[in-house]
């Protein structure tokens, strides 16, 4: 038929060459060039999309817009409108009349693919431009050889096919079904033909079309059958629909027919720049970004009740469409509101029945495309006219000017050399608020057919597939389209092969394995024997047994503060921080924990050698436990602790001989290490010099350099480090023995002065400055002051110490030289250190009584502090029984009132604050809340973050006053929040949500190490439900609490029934609001705060159903609850067991 009409074109040309059809010429001036515009329009064909009554107004609006932008200011226009209705015969007749008789300068339309081919062919004979709009996206229309003067603002549907192919390749979908709606202009059929052509292109991703079917919207039975047939053949469906009603019908069908599960993806392909929308209708809601009515809305003022069904179907739909971002949304809104009236006004003056008596309520679907193609013509016309004012119809000059770009009503319009639009497609989806969102761009470089994808998301699961359970659907289900092709279990498929292979493999390796086992048996036994010398199983290290334990599990006792009965080391010492005493083979040993690390053979050999080191001034290394989460070194116990503790924590005097013996022991141990395979200690400090019962110093923590490297040294430890170690940040393996000599000098200065290293209490410098100055060095480097109050100190010893901390390592004496000089300094009159110590202890006992008295005073003071703290943590009665070592039995209370509160939108408020500001805010708020609680005699159970739990009526019963105390306190809370100002957020307001319930409750103490006074019972849970189901700045009461309040305190409070509410775990409950005390209610506040009298019902659906994607009240659109207090763990904690 198409070829017949093309052959008849010359005949129609001669028949109508002398006929002048009736038209409406309009001129806006007589002195400027007047351009004749022929418009081939449609009124009855696809009227909602291309009807002249809903689209024609775009022409004068575009001309008006052009002139505002400085275009076509030198031209006037005459319009000739004929209605061809996309009929080929009418198109030929109208085309001949326009071109031959009226000699128009440009033709707009017709808006159909078949008709515009005819019009474009005629226009080629007369060399006149034809502006295409509407259903003119077929690929052959971009053929410059056939249609050199056809200009469209729609890309070819073939590019839509390449974009869809790229999307399928991205998501690895290789099987699709093609569905399209039947129409009189066969637009979707042509689009699907082009899509099928691109899918068959061997250069594109391999896609199998398993079904291609046409849908007749007028035949509901056939439509259901076609859509249902997809179930057994495909899960990815590409579909096309021209009308918004057809799109909505499709979404309803897939919901009703079960094609809306998480297995199906329905990809709508379109080139109308509207995505999930249709043109805005009066009284309809719109998308926030595009200003269009959501497609699932009813298209008439009378709803059909299927909006939610269509909306559910829309969640399984993705849309490939032209970019719908309009830069000038204000003008688009203006256009939508005025286009229906403009067509009836000059210069178009449409007076047909369709224009005058139109019932349309919105702009036509392709009106924006008509606007953009006229606007494009105006730009090209102005460009060629600006070059030569006398030339505006020379096609050789005019046509190249169409190759341009501008921001139109359909987004960015960019025309290529083929006079067709370079597409910028977008993939649209719906977010969790059912707002249209762009997921990716699919763009084409000029002259290419390969789409370039630019993703707009970083997490595909949450951005694209949130309605599919976060999982991308497969083109072919795992169990097949009929569910009967599920893969067999692994063992059923491969069990026999595995057993056979395993048997062959075992036979092959058995011989080799036996030989290999014999070879390694002796080696393992030898290695095990060697390792057993130093490796200690963790289970052999046992905790010390306490000599006394409390008889009551509720009693409060303090742990012992000493290691043994003879030790004088306090729990706060560095010795106790680093070491722990355990039992090993009936002996007490000293253990130290290190971070776990991988040990190589060299490390293990080192521990074997370390085990064999033995010297009277080295703390014997027994072994290392490596079979737990941490390494634990085991050495002999030195019960008197470290030298650091003895020097600073001891309160007995030391004479020169005592000092000399200690210094000599340190030097002897250091000298032995320097001669051993270790070469040096590397971590010599007064804290690593331990003292045993015989007052003999033993060096510890040597040989653990690999383990200690995992621990970052504190600034205090660096006070003993040599300058060269500080400068180079040397590890133990990089140090020289002279570094130990420097550390020895610092220890000797501590012993002589009995002050901490560098005497930081008396110095102005801190750790950082001293370390910096030691590292800096210089001619007069900083060193500790040696000022001792011991009268008989040998000056030679002081000189030796100063030699040991010389700046240059080579200037320091060796450890062996130090020992020789110390032997020469040995006092002749002294026998041994133990005799000397016994004499000193006799002197020490004289000061013991004074110390005991001072400690007794300190103990009394601390006991008062502990009692005060305990009274704030637990009720007074409970605290007294616990202090007495008595068991606190659970106690039941027949009637109490439980109070829950929560700060509304605390997460949003906290996000605007720094952590310190959040802490200060809660501290200011809760400090005043605590004052209010004390005023009303209410017991504060706990505060969890921004939540509060209080109770009245326990542990001291108060009759029925508990409901009054809680209500009064709640009102005081609300009054305080009204006047509470956040210093750093003066515009923000703190609002509370309060829930109250009255009933029986059980209270008792739970826990041993940290006892808590806990509440148990359904009354607590129900109070929590009241808070979570309450509203901001309102006090929510259960019916039990309300009845108690009204019965015992009538006419004192104003309340209002909220109605029946579905409470999780409780069913339907009638609840009440407390508005205030009688006579204190302001009308404005009452009207603002009191909810409607109408009954509310809330429904919470199970999270695994499609309906659970939102929680809403009747009549409201789905929304997400962003309240941070609805976290499940938080709610569970508050509802089940609430502790302080």
Swiss-Prot record:
Residues 517-1140 are cytoplasmic. Its EC number is 4.6.1.2. Its main location: membrane. One of its GO terms (biological process) is intracellular signal transduction. Residues 1-21 form the signal peptide. It is a single-pass type I membrane protein. GO terms for molecular function: ATP binding; GTP binding; guanylate cyclase activity; peptide receptor activity; protein kinase activity. Residues 538-826 form the Protein kinase domain. ATP binds at residues 544-552, 582. Residues 22-495 are extracellular. Keywords: ATP-binding, Cell membrane, cGMP biosynthesis, Glycoprotein, GTP-binding, Lyase, Membrane, Nucleotide-binding, Receptor, Signal, Transmembrane, Transmembrane helix. The protein kinase domain is predicted to be catalytically inactive. Guanylate cyclase involved in the production of the second messenger cGMP. This is Receptor-type guanylate cyclase gcy-3. It comes from Caenorhabditis elegans. The gene is gcy-3.
């Amino acid at each position: 038929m198409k070829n017949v009409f093309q052959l008849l074109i010359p005949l129609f040309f001669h028949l109508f060459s002398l006929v002048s059809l009736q038209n409406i010429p309009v001129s806006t001036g007589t002195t400027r060039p007047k351009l004749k515009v022929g418009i081939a329009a449609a009124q009855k064909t696809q009227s909602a999309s291309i009807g002249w009554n809903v689209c024609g107004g775009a022409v004068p609006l575009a001309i008006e817009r052009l002139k505002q932008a400085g275009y076509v200011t030198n031209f006037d226009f005459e319009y000739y409108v004929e209605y061809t209705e996309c009929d080929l015969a009418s198109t030929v007749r109208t085309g001949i009349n326009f071109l031959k008789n009226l000699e128009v300068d440009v033709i707009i339309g017709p808006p159909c693919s078949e008709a515009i081919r005819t019009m474009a062919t005629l226009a080629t004979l007369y060399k006149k431009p034809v502006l295409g709009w509407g259903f003119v996206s077929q690929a052959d229309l971009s053929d410059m050889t056939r249609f050199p003067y056809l200009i469209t603002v729609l890309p070819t549907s073939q590019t839509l096919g390449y974009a869809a192919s790229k999307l399928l390749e991205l998501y690895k979908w290789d099987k699709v079904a093609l569905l399209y709606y039947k129409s009189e202009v066969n637009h979707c059929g042509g689009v699907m033909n082009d899509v099928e052509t691109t899918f068959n292109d061997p250069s594109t991703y391999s896609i199998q079309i398993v079904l291609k079917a046409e849908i007749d919207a007028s035949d509901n039975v056939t439509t259901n059958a076609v859509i249902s047939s997809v179930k057994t053949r495909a899960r990815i469906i590409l579909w096309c629909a021209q009308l918004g009603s057809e799109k909505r019908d499709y979404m309803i069908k897939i919901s009703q027919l079960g094609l809306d599960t998480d297995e199906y993806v329905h990809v709508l392909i379109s080139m109308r720049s509207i995505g999930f929308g249709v043109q805005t209708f009066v009284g309809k809601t719109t998308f926030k970004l595009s200003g269009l009515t959501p497609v699932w809305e009813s298209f008439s003022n009378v709803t059909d009740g299927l909006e939610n069904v269509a909306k559910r179907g829309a969640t399984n739909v993705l849309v490939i469409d032209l970019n719908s971002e309009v830069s000038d949304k204000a003008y688009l809104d203006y256009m939508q509101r005025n286009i229906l009236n403009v067509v009836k006004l000059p210069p178009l003056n449409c007076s047909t029945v369709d224009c005058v008596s139109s019932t349309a309520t919105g702009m036509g679907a392709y009106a924006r495309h008509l606007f953009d193609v006229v606007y494009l013509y105006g730009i090209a016309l102005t460009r060629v006219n600006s070059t030569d004012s006398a030339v505006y119809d020379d096609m050789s000059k005019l046509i190249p000017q169409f190759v341009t770009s501008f921001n139109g009503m359909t987004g960015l319009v960019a025309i290529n050399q083929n006079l067709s639009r370079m597409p910028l497609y977008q993939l649209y989806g719906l977010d969790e608020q059912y707002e249209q969102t762009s997921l990716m761009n699919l763009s084409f470089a000029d002259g290419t057919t390969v789409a370039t994808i630019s993703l707009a998301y970083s997490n595909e699961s949450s951005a694209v597939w949130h309605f599919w359970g976060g999982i991308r659907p497969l083109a072919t289900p795992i169990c097949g389209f009929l569910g009967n092709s599920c893969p067999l279990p692994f063992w059923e498929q491969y069990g026999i092969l595995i057993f056979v292979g395993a048997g062959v493999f075992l036979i092959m390796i058995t011989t080799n394995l036996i030989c290999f086992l014999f070879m390694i048996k002796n080696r393992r036994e030898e290695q095990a024997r060697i390792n057993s010398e130093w490796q200690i199983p963790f289970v052999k290290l046992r905790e010390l047994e306490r000599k006394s334990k409390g008889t009551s599990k509720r009693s409060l006792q303090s742990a012992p503060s000493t290691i043994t009965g003879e030790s004088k080391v306090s729990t706060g010492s560095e010795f106790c921080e680093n070491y722990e005493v355990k039992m090993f083979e009936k002996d007490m040993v000293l253990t130290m924990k290190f971070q776990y690390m991988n040990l190589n053979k060299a490390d293990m050999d080192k521990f074997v050698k370390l085990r064999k080191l033995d010297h009277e001034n080295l703390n014997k290394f027994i072994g290392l436990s490596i079979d737990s989460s941490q390494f634990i070194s085991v050495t002999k116990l030195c019960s008197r602790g470290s030298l650091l503790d003895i020097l600073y924590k001891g309160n007995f005097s030391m004479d020169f001989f005592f000092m000399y013996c200690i210094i000599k022991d340190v030097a002897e141990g250091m000298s032995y290490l320097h001669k051993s395979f270790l070469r040096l200690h590397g971590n010599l400090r007064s804290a690593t010099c331990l003292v045993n019962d015989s007052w003999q110093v033993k060096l510890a923590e040597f040989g653990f350099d690999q383990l200690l490297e995992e621990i970052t040294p504190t600034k205090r430890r660096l006070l003993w480090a040599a300058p060269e170690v500080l400068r180079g940040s040397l590890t133990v393996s990089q140090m020289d023995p002279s570094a130990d000599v420097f550390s020895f000098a610092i220890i000797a200065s501590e012993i002589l002065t009995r002050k901490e290293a560098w005497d930081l209490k008396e110095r102005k410098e801190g750790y950082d400055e001293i370390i910096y100055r030691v590292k800096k060095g210089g001619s007069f480097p900083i060193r500790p002051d040696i000022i001792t109050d011991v009268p008989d100190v040998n000056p030679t010893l002081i000189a030796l110490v100063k030699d040991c901390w010389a700046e240059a390592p080579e200037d320091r004496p060796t450890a062996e030289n130090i020992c020789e000089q110390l032997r020469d300094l040995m006092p002749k009159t002294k026998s041994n250190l133990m005799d000397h110590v016994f004499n000193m202890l006799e002197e020490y006992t004289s000061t013991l009584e004074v110390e005991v008295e001072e400690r007794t005073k300190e103990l009394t003071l601390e006991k008062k502090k502990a009692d005060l703290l305990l009274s704030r943590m637990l009720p007074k009665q409970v605290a007294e029984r616990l202090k007495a070592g008595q068991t606190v039995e659970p106690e039941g209370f027949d009637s109490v009132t439980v109070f829950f509160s929560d700060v509304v939108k605390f997460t949003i408020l906290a996000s605007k604050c720094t952590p310190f500001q959040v802490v200060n805010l809660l501290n200011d708020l809760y400090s005043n809340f605590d004052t209010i609680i004390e005023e009303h005699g209410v017991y504060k159970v706990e505060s969890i973050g921004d939540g509060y739990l209080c109770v009245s009526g326990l542990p001291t019963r108060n009759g029925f006053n508990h409901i009054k105390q809680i209500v009064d306190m709640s009102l005081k809370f609300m009054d305080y929040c009204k006047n509470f100002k956040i210093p750093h957020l003066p515009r923000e307001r703190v609002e509370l949500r309060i829930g109250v319930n009255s009933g029986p409750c059980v209270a008792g103490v739970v826990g041993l190490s940290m006892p808590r006074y806990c509440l148990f019972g359904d009354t607590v849970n129900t109070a929590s439900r009241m808070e979570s189901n309450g509203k901001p700045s309102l006090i929510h009461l259960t019916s039990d609490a309300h009845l108690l309040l009204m019965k015992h305190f009538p006419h004192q409070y104003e309340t209002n029934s909220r109605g029946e509410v579905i409470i999780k775990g409780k069913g339907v409950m009638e609840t009440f609001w407390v508005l205030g005390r009688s006579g204190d209610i302001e009308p404005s506040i009452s009207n603002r705060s009191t909810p409607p009298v109408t009954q509310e019902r809330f429904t919470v659906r199970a999270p695994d159903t499609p309906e659970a994607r939102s929680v809403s009240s009747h009549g409201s659109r789905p929304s997400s609850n962003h309240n941070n207090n609805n976290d499940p763990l938080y709610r569970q904690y508050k509802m089940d067991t609430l502790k302080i």
